[in-house]
Amino acid sequence: MRASLDTNVIIHFYKANLQNILFDFFDEGVFIYEQIRNVELENHGQDVISKVDSDIAAGRIEIYTNQKLKDLQVYKIFEHNVNENRNLYGSGDLGEVYAISLAQTLGAYSLVTDDTKQGGPYMSL
């Protein structure tokens, strides 16, 4: 099974040193959108970012960039999903918007998020 990760769960799993649960359970891949690594984790996850970067370098986490999505010929679908999810969930938590949009675009069955609000993105796949 494959999974798209939201920023906060990355931070929670790594702070608890339980990130291997993600890699064991989602044996077909764990992935994030570049904005989650380059903006959200830079701003909110400084204490775990070196461990995350190690797992990215080791191929345990795959980063999807705009260019990679274009190369896969799914960038426009991703862009549409981002716009739709921004309308649904607002721009307050862009990590959440990008995580769900990436899962939808790539056909992942799992979104790992700590969101619990009624009608939140966990209900979107």
Spans of features found by a protein language model:
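Active-site-proximal, substrate-binding regions of enzyme catalytic domains
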Residues: 1-109, 116-125
